[in-house]
Amino acid sequence: MASNLPLQLPAGVSDLLPPEAAALRQLEQRLLNCFRSWGYQEVMTPTFEFATTFQAGSPAGEEGALYKFIDRQGRVLALRPEMTAPIARLVATSLRRRELPLRLGYSARVFRYEEPQAGRRREFHQAGVELIGAGGVAGDVEIIALAVESLAQAGLEDFRLGLGQVAVTKGVLQDLALPPEAVAGIKSALASKDLVALERIYDEYHLEGERRRRLELLATIHGGREALEEARACFGRTAAAASLAELSRVWEALGAAGLEKWLFIDLGILRDFDYYTGIVFEGYVPGLGAPVCGGGRYDGLLAQFGYPCPATGFALGLERLLLARGETAPASLAGGYLVAGRDLAALLKRARELRSKGTAVVLDGESRSRQEAAARAAARGLNLEWIGE
């Protein structure tokens, strides 16, 4: 009888076959083990919550990326588009009496109704950490250092983390005293490195001389220690000076720890969400036009859940990490056994003995001969153990 069930998947989702599933699980465990070694404890939040949870701190345009639905009581729910807001809600409710700082880690599927990108579809996997209650330079340094180690543990060798400071951008824009629509346009252009859009804004709002130069530097400053020096020379007497000094202290601490070779300064990094308040960062690898890692400080977010508290963290996109590595784990059960024969009770007993030693075992009670079982074992990359005559 013909089936009327759909055989195709909706746009933006995909199945994971054994090689991809094995690679993702191995990567996930390596990252969770890395987080644990730094004292971060794993938490889990629901796949869906009230939509208002995810609207906290999110730009107006991001609300359209939510997968929303209505429950039987008429309340609007949504699939989680990221993990920071749910963990902020969890801390403000279930963990608010715990001693700070809290170090929390996670690995979870998230959902965004966006155009699919390289290594990120509408359903994708994130792993990350949140450091709750640690304000200032020490917390920023810890999180960035952990991000570097996480990327190394993920199997990447040629990666770089770009460091920015959204408060520098806010300070520069504050000094310019532009209308809100101009500020929004500048933020969007800086985030996308759209120099043409910036040129239009310069012309429209008659930004010239030193005012224009400061915006141009925000968009173009890029590099190491010399980039910081250039930024200090330009912004040292503006509202951005204190934030820039904080970024310099973070850079110096990370450099003293031997991490400078993985870092660069990019004041155009603003991240996707409005709740970032201080130092932000993104991780890149050659040949992949999207970040594999991103995060930063969001000191105002927990206050929206009734628990004012400084916080910082980051997330890694697992599919993007696998794409950057360009490889998958073997899906075979290499080193395992095919236990074959006609005596099913004997097969089960022997399989249990082997599994107790940590060996993967496939049962075969259908092969009619040792030769047939040997062919099946070879096709699966397994060792053969024949029981019987």
From Swiss-Prot:
Subcellular location: Cytoplasm
Signal peptide range in chain numbering: none
Superkingdom to which the source organism belongs: Bacteria
Pfam family, one: tRNA-synt_His
Disulfide bonding pattern of the chain: none
GO MF annotation terms: catalytic activity, acting on a protein; histidine-tRNA ligase activity; transferase activity
Pathway: Amino-acid biosynthesis; L-histidine biosynthesis; L-histidine from 5-phospho-alpha-D-ribose 1-diphosphate: step 1/9
CDD domains recorded: HisRS-like_core
PROSITE patterns in alphabetical order: AA_TRNA_LIGASE_II
Example GO BP: histidyl-tRNA aminoacylation
Keywords attached to this entry: Amino-acid biosynthesis, Cytoplasm, Histidine biosynthesis
Any one cellular-component term (Gene Ontology): cytoplasm
SUPFAM superfamilies xrefs: Class II aaRS and biotin synthetases
Subunit structure: Heteromultimer composed of HisG and HisZ subunits.
Additional information: This function is generally fulfilled by the C-terminal part of HisG, which is missing in some bacteria such as this one.
Function as written in the Swiss-Prot or TrEMBL entry: Required for the first step of histidine biosynthesis. May allow the feedback regulation of ATP phosphoribosyltransferase activity by histidine.
Family of this protein: Belongs to the class-II aminoacyl-tRNA synthetase family. HisZ subfamily.
Protein name (record): ATP phosphoribosyltransferase regulatory subunit
Lineage, uppermost ranks: Bacteria, Bacillati, Bacillota, Clostridia, Moorellales
